[in-house]
Amino acid sequence: MPHSNISRAPRQHLTERVLQAKTAKNLTWAGLAEGTGLSVVYVTAALLGQHPLPQAVAEVVAERLGLDRDAVAELQTIPLRGNVEDVSSDPTIYRFHEMVQVYGTTLKALVHEQFGDGIISAINFKLDIKKVDDPEGGERAVITLDGKFLPYKPF
């Protein structure tokens, strides 16, 4: 039976344990996700407290991290999602906020023009990030947000 958190505290505490173990064991997110059948993005988000993991995956990553049975159970619990009460001051996270501040209304206008009145699901959703060479030198981040369009329905 699925269980659900009504507080962020249990997952925040577990996330700290995950990060400590990951660092101590010199593991990567890709290494933790390897062989689970889930994407590195999903497993990373789950280990950072944003998704539950299936039991088999929770057991695999907990073993890799050296976590106990209580951690395996908590990794399967549906979390209280979202961990930012206000705008984060972390520069990487803030840049995403800034992108939405600058391009949010443009994205909204283009989504509505191309799809109609509705939203892009963050539930039926995939996220990918790739590092590519910049022709002008350096590297670029290519981030793909792939969500199902859900139209509003009159009733």
Swiss-Prot record:
Q: Which UniProt keywords apply?
A: Lyase
Enzyme Commission number(s) from the entry: 4.2.1.104
Could you cite one Gene Ontology molecular function of this protein? Answer: DNA binding
- SMART domains according to UniProt: Cyanate_lyase
* Substrates-to-products reaction catalysed: cyanate + hydrogencarbonate + 3 H(+) = NH4(+) + 2 CO2
Q: Name one GO biological process term.
A: cyanate metabolic process
Q: Where is the active site?
A: 95, 98, 121
Q: What class of enzyme is it?
A: lyase
Keyword tRNA processing attached: no
Gene3D superfamilies hit by this protein: Cyanate lyase, C-terminal domain, lambda repressor-like DNA-binding domains
Tell me where the signal peptide lies: none
Could you tell me which Pfam families the record lists for this protein? Cyanate_lyase, CYNS_N
| HAMAP family, per database record | Cyanate_hydrat
Biological role stated in the UniProt entry: Catalyzes the reaction of cyanate with bicarbonate to produce ammonia and carbon dioxide.
Q: Which NCBIfam families match?
A: cynS, PRK02866.1
The UniProt similarity line reads: Belongs to the cyanase family.
Matches recorded under PANTHER family: CYANATE HYDRATASE
What is the designated name of this protein?
Cyanate hydratase
